[in-house]
């Protein structure tokens, strides 16, 4: 009985597609709602989240792959080993690791960076490329900041040990700085425009 209903469903699907009905391609998630996904983020450390159990769309009705599908396929084909991206993507890691596994791909290592924060009205908010001109690199060139100064300031935001290194290595080129993901802020550095000036 189960077999005949599946065959009937497949025939209905085939007829609908052949009839021109729009369709999407979804992942049939092998996830278990009672199991956890464990991974080691290169900045945030060990993270535990529920496994993905959602049958997510991989190809949209226009034939364009979703970010999730493109991430797994493109990074596999390009032999990407490490992915650095904003921490708003942490919630997607269980799905992404699941996609790598079901596709038979070696998973990448993730480093999720916290957004740069800005003080506003007594609180903090994420620096926004839509609302804040200082979020664009071109802004600093337009207002006359030397590139070297901007690079130095950005390194103070990215690595907590940069200022100590600079004091000890006043004449060293920035390329000598031993950048370390473990020294990045897990909660988001505060952008201080006054300090830059």
What is the meaning of each model-derived region?
Residues 1-8, 12-15:
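Single conserved hydrophobic/aromatic residue that forms the stacking wall/gate
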Residues 9-10, 50-53, 134-135, 196:
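Short acidic (Asp/Glu) patches
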Residues 13-19, 23-26, 32-69, 95, ...:
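Non-catalytic beta-strand/loop surface segments
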Residues 67, 78-86:
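A short, conserved beta-strand element enriched in hydrophobic/aromatic residues
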Residues 86-92:
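Active-site beta-loop-alpha junctions of metal-dependent nucleic acid enzymes
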Residues 102-197:
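Catalytic adenosine-cofactor/nucleotide-binding cores of aminoacyl-tRNA synthetases and other
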């Amino acid at each position: 009985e189960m077999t005949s209903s599946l065959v009937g469903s497949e025939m209905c699907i085939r007829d609908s597609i052949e009839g021109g009905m729009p369709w999407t391609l979804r992942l049939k998630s092998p996830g278990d709602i009672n199991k956890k996904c464990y991974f080691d983020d290169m900045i945030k450390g060990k993270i535990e989240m529920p496994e993905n159990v959602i049958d997510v769309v991989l190809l949209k009705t226009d034939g364009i792959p979703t970010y999730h599908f493109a991430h797994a396929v493109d990074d596999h084909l390009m032999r990407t080993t490490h992915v650095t991206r904003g921490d708003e993507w942490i919630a997607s890691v269980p799905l992404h690791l699941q996609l790598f596994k079901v596709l038979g791909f070696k998973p990448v290592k993730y480093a999720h960076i916290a957004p740069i924060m800005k003080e506003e009205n007594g609180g903090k908010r994420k620096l926004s490329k839509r609302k804040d001109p200082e979020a664009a690199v071109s802004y600093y060139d337009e207002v006359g900041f030397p590139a070297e100064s901007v690079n130095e300031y950005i390194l103070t935001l990215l690595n907590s040990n940069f200022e100590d290194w600079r004091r000890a290595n006043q004449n060293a080129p920035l390329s000598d700085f031993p950048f370390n993901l473990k020294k990045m802020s897990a909660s988001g550095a505060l952008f201080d425009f006054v300090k830059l000036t």
